[in-house]
């Protein structure tokens, strides 16, 4: 007798559930996507004990025909595709017919549905077996209750995390769905308390504000662009609003949230050098394309897709993000922080030993005003905005530990630069490089220097504070970016050629990238086994640091493995600009300071240093008047901040 036999349908469904239904958040995702496919305008999600006890999803969609209710729980039964051709042009969220039978095989499911023109139907299934099926009173749409998850597979329960973690995963799923479908009203209720609600009015900024906070919504910029195959639209944050991880970037393909490293990388690349190292923007990007160009049938949970013409899409995404950011005035304005302090402040007297309290918005965010250490001095305490809804407040707390890279968060280098003449570090030659950004950068009048680190200047619209190190670093960066690569005429010989020794593996990598190194001025010649000789170096190398600079550039190639000439030159320019820039606590005379301010507007990007830190922050005249309480501020309704329509 043969050893191979066919598994029964219940066991097969349980095996399939292992891939599709990993945790309560998986149930929320699958059921909510079914509701979206049913053209629902409202989807209410109710969970108890983080979904470990029950998950309920109610929608106002098309409902299920009475004859199809039981059939919907058969494996691979679906209304969304009919033949093999449909599999390559999927336009719905689901299409495999796996979700409902997988859920029903490991849980207790009660489904009630109606199509509007007929009597409702109800079915009760547990462990894959139908317990009851018949007519029921129901409003149009579908109401499905899932309870006792994994009751018959207790081993699966061991791999679930704490209720807090499981709830966080559900919240993340609902957030992504709401961002992908701003025209659908979502609500999420946990243990009887509503924690999220979106209006479903199509205003994406309002959804962002409900999830990430009102200030985040205000700092989002619209992006839009297309080519013959792709259409990109959505919102990205200004460079001053960042997070420590990539998880706040939501990228959708035809309104389906997906994970794609190349697209995420392109989105970040669109900011060029405007982001600080290790910081990432908030973004909500949707890419509309012909379904033929994307294969969504490559991952059990459909989180990953395979794209045709991906390089073309990567270029388009990077370009539209870059264009959107370049059109903005990127000088951080302190108006939002001043408004927050003056319209919702509460002044208390703190003893000398008390630690200064800061806004609840971010536990690690520095306060706008540092309190005096002397006893009895006022400490500013910001309160939660009364304009935000309870749902917005709840989700602000959800993200309260994330930093916002405001101008007050930029810390100057505390080390004192030892005396080198400032005139050697600040070039007084003002070259004519054009004024690409001059229209967006103000005409500044120099006032003075603060702490040997910041330059104070004024313009017609208020006070500007310029970080002198960041300013010259930006000027140097754009100079070196152009100079690196002009190797034929700008080489200087070493008195004694350098001999660089490496391991066999590293030597092979260097040989592979010799062309990149040569294009940037490092002409390495083989010199024995696993060794190279360097006879000359570019003239832009810092005097006395030629060998260190050469080794550092080679180390970049070894670390990256794959590096284009463009990327290599950018990295080298960043290194050189930082090494030759004036440091904090370095005194400049008036002539040197004015020369620095005069060169800054000539930069292609005068707003950020190459590492992404802001060069300048701005106090408008209105901000100053508010700080001194010379004017009062009126409150505006929360929704008005993100209303795209005029009255």
Curated annotation (Swiss-Prot):
InterPro entries reported in the protein's UniProt record: DNA_mismatch_repair_CS, DNA_mismatch_repair_MutL, DNA_mismatch_S5_2-like, HATPase_C_sf, MutL/Mlh/PMS, MutL/Mlh/Pms-like, MutL_C, MutL_C_dimsub
Pfam families: DNA_mis_repair, HATPase_c_3, MutL_C
SMART domains assigned to the protein according to its UniProt record, in alphabetical order: DNA_mis_repair, MutL_C
SUPFAM superfamilies the record matches: ATPase domain of HSP90 chaperone/DNA topoisomerase II/histidine kinase, DNA mismatch repair protein MutL, Ribosomal protein S5 domain 2-like
Disulfide pairings: none
Sample GO molecular function, one term: mismatched DNA binding
Family per record: Belongs to the DNA mismatch repair MutL/HexB family.
Annotated function: This protein is involved in the repair of mismatches in DNA. It is required for dam-dependent methyl-directed DNA mismatch repair. May act as a 'molecular matchmaker', a protein that promotes the formation of a stable complex between two or more DNA-binding proteins in an ATP-dependent manner without itself being part of a final effector complex.
Protein name stated in the entry: DNA mismatch repair protein MutL
Organism: Limosilactobacillus fermentum (strain NBRC 3956 / LMG 18251)
């Amino acid at each position: 007798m043969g050893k191979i036999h066919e598994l029964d349908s219940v066991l097969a469904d349980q095996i399939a559930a292992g891939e599709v239904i990993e945790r309560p958040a998986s149930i929320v995702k699958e059921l909510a996507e079914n509701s979206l496919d049913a053209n629902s305008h409202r989807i209410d999600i109710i969970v108890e004990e983080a979904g470990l006890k029950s998950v309920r999803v109610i929608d106002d969609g098309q409902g299920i025909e009475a004859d199809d209710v039981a059939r919907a729980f058969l494996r691979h039964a679906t209304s969304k595709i009919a033949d093999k051709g449909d599999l390559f042009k999927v336009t719905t969220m689901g299409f495999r017919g796996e979700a409902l039978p997988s859920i029903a095989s490991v849980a207790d499911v009660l489904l009630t549905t109606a199509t509007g023109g007929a009597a409702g139907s109800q079915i009760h299934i547990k462990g894959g077996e139908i317990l009851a099926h018949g007519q029921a009173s129901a409003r149009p749409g579908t109401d499905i209750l899932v309870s006792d998850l994994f009751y018959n597979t207790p081993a699966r329960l061991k791999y679930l995390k704490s209720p807090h973690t499981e709830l966080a995963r559900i919240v993340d799923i609902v957030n992504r769905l709401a961002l992908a479908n701003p025209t659908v009203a979502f609500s999420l209720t946990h243990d009887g308390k509503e924690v999220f609600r979106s209006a479903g009015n199509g205003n994406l900024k309002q959804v962002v504000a409900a999830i990430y906070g009102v200030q985040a919504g205000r700092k989002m910029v619209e992006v839009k662009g297309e080519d013959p195959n792709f259409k990109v639209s959505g919102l990205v944050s200004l460079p001053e609003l960042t997070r420590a991880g990539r998880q706040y970037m939501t990228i959708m393909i035809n309104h389906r949230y997906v994970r794609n490293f190349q697209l995420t990388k392109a989105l970040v690349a669109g900011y060029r050098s405007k982001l600080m190292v290790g910081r990432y923007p908030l973004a909500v990007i949707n890419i509309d394309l012909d379904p033929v160009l994307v294969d969504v049938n490559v991952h059990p949970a459909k989180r990953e897709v395979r794209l045709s013409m991906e390089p073309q899409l990567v270029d388009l995404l990077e370009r539209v993000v870059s264009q959107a950011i370049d059109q903005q005035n990127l000088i951080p304005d302190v108006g939002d922080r001043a408004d927050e302090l003056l319209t919702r402040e509460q002044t208390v007297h703190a003893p000398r030993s008390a630690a200064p309290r800061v806004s609840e918005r971010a536990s690690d965010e520095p306060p706008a005003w540092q309190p005096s250490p002397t006893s009895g001095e006022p400490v500013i305490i910001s309160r939660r905005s009364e304009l935000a809804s309870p749902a917005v407040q709840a989700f602000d707390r959800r993200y309260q530990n994330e930093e916002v890279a405001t101008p007050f968060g930029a810390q100057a280098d505390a080390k004192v630069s030892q005396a080198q003449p400032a005139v050697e570090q600040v070039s007084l030659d003002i070259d004519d490089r054009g004024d690409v950004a001059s229209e967006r950068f103000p005409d500044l009048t120099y006032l003075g220097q603060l702490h040997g680190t910041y330059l104070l200047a004024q313009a017609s619209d208020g006070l500007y504070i310029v970080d002198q190190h960041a300013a010259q670093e930006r000027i140097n960066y754009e100079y070196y970016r152009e100079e690196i690569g002009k190797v034929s005429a700008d080489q200087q010989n070493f008195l004694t050629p350098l001999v660089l020794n490496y391991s066999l593996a590293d030597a092979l990598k260097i040989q592979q990238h010799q062309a990149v190194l040569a294009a940037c001025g490092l002409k390495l010649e083989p010199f024995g086994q696993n060794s190279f000789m360097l006879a000359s170096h570019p003239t832009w190398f810092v005097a006395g640091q030629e060998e260190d600079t050469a080794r550092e550039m080679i180390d970049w190639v070894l670390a990256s493995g794959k590096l284009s000439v463009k990327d290599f030159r950018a990295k080298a320019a960043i290194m050189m600009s930082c090494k030759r820039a004036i440091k904090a606590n370095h005194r400049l005379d008036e002539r040197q300071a004015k020369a620095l301010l005069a060169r800054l507007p000539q930069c292609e990007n005068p707003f950020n240093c190459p590492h992404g830190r802001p060069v300048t922050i701005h106090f408008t005249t209105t901000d100053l008047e508010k700080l001194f309480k010379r004017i009062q501020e009126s409150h505006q309704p929360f929704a008005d901040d993100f209303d795209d329509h005029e009255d």
